[in-house]
Amino acid sequence: MKRSAPVQFAKKDVANCRWLGEFLVHLESTRNVSAKTVTAYTTDLIQFFEFLTDESGHQEMSAVDPELVEVADVRRFMGDLLDSGIKPRSIARKLASVKSFYRFLLDTGKIERSPLSLVLTPRLERKIPDFLSEEEASRLFDQLVLSDQESVGPEQGQKAAVQRFELARDRAVLELLYGCGLRLSEVTGLENADVDLVHGFLKVTGKGRKQRIVPFGEPAAEALRNYFEVRRNFFRILKEGAGETSKVFVTAKGRQIYPMLVQRMTKRYLSPVTESARKNPHMLRHTFATHMLNGGADLKSVSEMLGHSNLTTTELYTHVTFNRLRDAYTKAHPRA
């Protein structure tokens, strides 16, 4: 019986899998990973040991000893996932979870060898990310500025006030997604104390709760100043809401904005300026990286601003730079 679909897990599943509970505590306390990441690791590992339980004919996961797992077991698991139509990228992620678990067992002296040492991660095709051209980015923010200015009219009442507030907020959110290359979780989690308008930088808390400093330009600074003023006036009139959270970006009810709101917002504003199928917040992060490298920024600096742990991830964006150089060569060289 195949177990390729992700399983729903409970505390008893974790308890039944030897050493899994200790590994999850290690992730949370030592590596500072998010709850979402811990859930992903747990799901992947329980799926792995559920598969081994079925393969071995046992009734309970507790009967499967991680120390006795062989290379062939891991390869059969990967083959089962592939046969079930799981994409190579998802298989690679699941394999990475299993590798992390066994690395923990080795590091803590629970086992002397890992069956993962001879298992290679599937080779993945690195897709070029969607991004806006510089002209499309200009149209996006020209549209936002115009909408923001038009919202300051004679209309009165709560509906008009909410519209002015949301336009100012949306413009500031999109300026930071593009101007600083922030991740969705980073912009929704941004604290008031993280914004330094005087010196023009943000203190960003990224993956693994790692913090970094990211500069921003005058357009983003102007959008933030405008938003802070509109937000202050809006909640002063309402006399409620804004004091409930320390977050920069809030809803009209004063609560922290949530990912789906930003995703809908991004799609709405990107739709008039690009035909790309992926109109999401990450597209603006891709655009930030692409435009920075095209403008001559060095790879290491862009990598630091994006919060990448290694340069390899950032190198994905250099394709545009190479294309630009190829175009220049083709147009200029007599033997191109």
From Swiss-Prot:
Localization per record: Cytoplasm
One Pfam family of this chain: Phage_int_SAM_1
Catalytic residues identified in the record: R183, K207, H282, R285, H308, Y317
Record-annotated Tyr recombinase domain positions: 127-330
GO CC terms in record: cytoplasm
Gene3D superfamilies: 1.10.150.130, Intergrase catalytic core
Record keyword Transmembrane helix present: no
Gene Ontology MF terms: DNA binding; tyrosine-based site-specific recombinase activity
Keywords, alphabetical: Cell cycle, Cell division, Chromosome partition, Cytoplasm, DNA integration, DNA recombination, DNA-binding
Sequence ranges assigned to domain Core-binding (CB) in this UniProt record: 14-106
Sequence intervals crossing the membrane: none
Domain of life: Bacteria
Main location: cytoplasm
GO biological process: cell division; chromosome segregation; DNA transposition
Function, in words: Site-specific tyrosine recombinase, which acts by catalyzing the cutting and rejoining of the recombining DNA molecules. The XerC-XerD complex is essential to convert dimers of the bacterial chromosome into monomers to permit their segregation at cell division. It also contributes to the segregational stability of plasmids.
Assembly description: Forms a cyclic heterotetrameric complex composed of two molecules of XerC and two molecules of XerD.
Similarity annotation: Belongs to the 'phage' integrase family. XerC subfamily.
Name this polypeptide is given: Tyrosine recombinase XerC
Organism whose genome encodes this protein: Chlorobaculum tepidum (strain ATCC 49652 / DSM 12025 / NBRC 103806 / TLS)
